[in-house]
UniProtKB/Swiss-Prot annotation:
Pfam families tied to this protein: DEAD, Helicase_C
Binding site for ATP: A120, Q121, T122, G123, S124, G125, K126, T127
Species of origin: Arabidopsis thaliana (Mouse-ear cress)
Gene: RH58
Chief subcellular location: plastid
Stated name of the protein: DEAD-box ATP-dependent RNA helicase 58, chloroplastic
Length: 472
């Protein structure tokens, strides 16, 4: 196989020691040594980290430090020598001190220049992982686009841009700042064209359509970018109408041999087949590394899953009863997309009908907001702005809110319509339980008909969770 998971079988003589704990004992200079880089950049035929080469730098390992009680490695220790000091300082100011599992496993590999597929559950820190890689490679003195992050939706793009700008914020240290541009659907492309030509940003966060438009108009080029990230890669390849444009970005507008490519997602169906396609289609280099951090449970343990069986005609009243009994602090109510047949018949979408019902029947204090793909971009942005200004909310949304949007105050997810796939269930549920340092149990409630019970059972089996029936 042309990819590898991060396996280190030769470490059997270190009892109960993981790959990460070995790296936790190394000094930052360890990663700069020629022999170490040779070990980490093992040839495609070896597919495994060459510990014989690593052993050449054994003097770098502190005496008696490889034990079961090794102090956890900090993000600074992992990134020292790669990421600029002012970025590390800002990272710690924001509150990123200790790495998540995906950061601990992926960053040492990313810093060697290898292409990576970051595969870990929602809320696991994939965004910060690839941003730290980008900041390790950016040269602020160079006036060109050096990193491109491709996202499926405007909302996720706004979120990634916000985190990137927080990290890149000017510090007291006398260094030139790193500029970040958001090139997202619905933006003012004329202004972006002028910006790209006059003073190209170092980092560009873009939706597929807007990015391809700029490239086709020759406003700028990405054949010289150092890093290309595709976030929510499974959605862009398997669930969107932009597959052709994504493939073109990866092969026609730039070459995988001239850049470092990073794919990220919580769900990559048939990941072995996907890795094979990455190599065969030349989306990545042949020695791409699939870093799969699989939690014991695919779902966050802080989530409690429930379901209520009801008739379709009674769903509005059942939802209202759940809102009154559960009294969520904030909630997202997921509604299915309107079918083409329903649109042609001139029917109102389910989101509109539900919004009208809630505004007349819900007596609680939460603000009722709407987010769906058919809204104009200004309305969508306004909804998210209202949410982030504080206060509780009831957000009625289609699956546009299921990917990447971070609303930490969300305590409840209501699946008014059951998601169509197990992947959609995973991403919807992952919008709750994201508040840092909170041990609060959050609720995922499903409103289903008796005919849909077997579908929910299949999701339970695949995602290894148990769903309790509620009687109203």
């Amino acid at each position: 196989m042309a990819s590898q998971l991060l396996n280190v079988p030769h470490l059997a003589f270190f009892p109960k020691i993981s790959y990460a704990s070995v790296f936790s004992t190394l000094k930052p200079s360890f990663f700069h040594s020629t022999s170490t880089r040779r070990a980490l950049k093992s040839s495609p035929s070896s597919r495994i980290i060459n510990l014989q080469a690593v052993a050449e730098t054994s003097s770098e390992i502190e005496s008696n430090s490889v034990t079961e009680t090794t102090v956890p490695l900090t993000l600074r220790q992992i990134c020292q020598g790669f990421v600029p000091e002012h970025i590390l300082h800002r990272m710690e100011e924001i509150g990123f001190v200790f790495p998540t599992d995906i950061q601990r496993e992926a960053l040492p590999t990313l810093f060697t220049g290898r292409d990576c597929i970051l595969h870990a559950q929602t809320g696991s820190g994939k965004t910060l992982t690839y941003l730290l890689l980008i900041f390790s490679l950016i040269n602020p003195q160079r006036s060109s686009v050096q990193a491109v992050i491709v996202v499926p939706t405007r909302e996720l793009g706004m979120q990634v841009t916000k985190v990137a700008r927080m990290l890149a914020a000017k510090s007291e240290i006398d260094v030139k700042g790193c500029t970040v541009m958001a090139l997202l659907d619905g933006g003012t492309l004329r202004r972006h064209k002028s910006w790209l030509k006059a003073e190209p940003p170092a980092i560009l966060v873009a939706t597929v359509a807007s990015l391809c438009h700029m490239l086709e108009k020759h406003i700028f080029r990405i054949d010289s970018v150092r890093v290309l990230v595709v976030d929510e890669v499974d959605f862009l390849f398997y669930s969107s109408k932009q597959v052709g444009s994504v493939r073109k970005l990866l092969t026609s507008f730039s070459s995988c041999d001239k850049r470092q490519t990073v794919f990220a997602s919580a769900s990559i169906p048939q990941h072995k087949h996907f890795v094979h396609d990455c190599i065969q289609q030349k989306w990545t280099k042949r020695d791409v590394v699939h870093v799969h951090v699989s939690a014991i449970m695919p779902m966050p343990l802080c989530l409690l899953h429930r379901f209520v069986m009801c008739e379709k005609t009674n769903k509005h009243q059942v939802l209202l009863a759940l809102l009154e009994s559960d009294a969520p602090e904030s909630a997202i109510i997921f509604v299915g997309e309107q079918s083409e047949k329903s649109k042609k018949a001139g029917n109102d979408p389910s989101t509109t009908l539900l919004m009208e019902f809630l505004k007349t029947s819900y007596k609680g204090s939460l603000e009722i907001l709407l987010l769906e793909g058919d809204m104009n971009f200004n309305s969508r942005a306004a909804s998210l702005t209202e949410i982030r200004q504080g206060g509780g909310f009831l957000l009625v949304s289609t699956d546009i809110a299921a990917r990447g949007i971070d609303l930490p105050e969300t305590t409840h997810i209501f699946n008014f319509d059951l998601p169509q796939t197990v992947t959609d269930y995973l991403h919807r549920a992952g919008r709750a339980g994201r508040k840092p340092f909170s041990d609060r149990k959050c609720i995922v409630a499903n409103l289903i008909t008796s005919e849909e019970r077997f579908v929910l059972q299949r999701y339970e089996n695949e995602l290894m969770f148990s769903c309790e029936e509620m009687m109203l």
